[in-house]
Amino acid sequence: MTNLNPRDVVIVDGVRSAMGKSKNGMFRNVRADSLSAELVRALVARNQFDVNEVEDLIWGCVNQTLEQGMNIGRNIVLLADLPKTVAGQTVNRLCGSSMQAIHTAAAQIATNQGDIFIIGGVEHMGHVGMMHGIDLNPEASKHYAKASNMMGLTAEMLGRMNGIGREEQDAFGVESHRRAWAATQEGRFKNEIVGVEGHDANGFKILCDIDEVIRPDANLEAFKALRPVFDPKGGTVTAATSSALSDGASAMLLMSAERAQALGLKPRAVIRSMAVAGCDAAIMGYGPVPATQKALKRAGLSVADIQTVELNEAFAAQGLSVLKGLGLYEKQDIVNLNGGAIALGHPLGCSGARITTTLLNVMEQQDTQIGLATMCIGLGQGIATVIERV
């Protein structure tokens, strides 16, 4: 068992919603803030602690407008019936937003600026489109290629640079769905998914506790039949090898080790290290490589020490490129064992805490000790978190 110092940052618990399709999906009548509040209530109900001690609720969200606007973090505090004395903020590091929420809370705990934090993230891509209201600076093209704003083209670039062809991408995508559906059937998501009321295709209310985006019938023949979507003439990236558009939320409970101990709560993991890094916007998907290298160095570890990995699958070409860059290409049996974003979707602000929660559950299922959660970020960034079970 890991010996903990008083100001070590521990993960007490983590939950998420099921992932809903963004187009006419099960959460089409559920707001992003309401979905998030349901998770906060569940997190509080699952763990015995005084909510008056919560310092801050930190929520990741990318497109902060419409129902996701006006500091959705504070709105979630009020909707979840937390005490009015609990603060709330919203953070944005694009795809890495809710992992940044982890890092922000962890930094505050480590520096004695609070003992208990609720963090998480949400994105309702069906209600608030990824590019809704976006007005990019025309002068930006003087500083980086305009195509860098098109995530699919950055994936095409990585695929070409790393020799990852269409066949390999298709196989990776099919495997993501296979793993996710197997995890669903075997109940491996039960500890992390909180059922939230939504609607079925006929408009009847249902409890949504199974990921709607997974395709149980995913197969190579169907994937091969699809045309490239971003580079029609010579491309390799298709809709099936890209992360699905989905709606979802995630939440985690972080504490100082000393406060968790005083409350009699058993931590599930301790955060060993954290890092962010920048890279060329044209290959934004490569960001997890420098971010992970930084995080490992800070933890005094090497890639060989990592036993379980959750890598956000923005695209198959991107995920495979990162695995090559990190020396994990031949170790895909420790990466995304319950499937990844190609099967589950990538609700932007939700994904960081989602993959960290999934990582924690997979580590418990596999009885591994040290794990890595990492993801790429649009316009050329990466973020990484190393955790250790306690």
From Swiss-Prot:
Pathway: Lipid metabolism; fatty acid beta-oxidation
Compartmental location: Cytoplasm
Major localization class: cytoplasm
Active site residues of this protein: C95, H346, C376
Keyword Lipid metabolism: yes
Keywords: Acyltransferase, Cytoplasm, Fatty acid metabolism, Lipid degradation, Lipid metabolism, Transferase
EC number: 2.3.1.16
Reactions listed under catalytic activity: an acyl-CoA + acetyl-CoA = a 3-oxoacyl-CoA + CoA
UniProt subunit comment: Heterotetramer of two alpha chains (FadB) and two beta chains (FadA).
Function: Catalyzes the final step of fatty acid oxidation in which acetyl-CoA is released and the CoA ester of a fatty acid two carbons shorter is formed.
Name of the protein: 3-ketoacyl-CoA thiolase
Gene label: fadA
